[in-house]
Amino acid sequence: MLILTRRVGESLHIGDDIKITLLGIKGNQVRIGIDAPRDVEVHREEIYDRIRRETRKANRRTAEETLDQASRLLSQK
């Protein structure tokens, strides 16, 4: 993990397209601004974790449905 120190108003870049700026500090909270292309998804960790869980559930359901359909097709022959 790369650890950097920034002051309010300072930025860092990830690649050519992503810029992260430290906007402010209030107590134990830090406000950051993220400038990234629209095709780059940016999520808070708790939202990202929820998306991953829901995607896994959906993939499991899809796999189960596919197996059920294949089983029905095979039993018809």
Swiss-Prot record:
The keyword Repressor applies. Residues 68-77 have a biased composition (Polar residues). It holds the Pfam family CsrA. GO terms for cellular component: cytosol. It is found in: Cytoplasm. One of its GO terms (biological process) is regulation of carbohydrate metabolic process. This is Translational regulator CsrA. It comes from Magnetococcus marinus (strain ATCC BAA-1437 / JCM 17883 / MC-1). The gene is csrA.
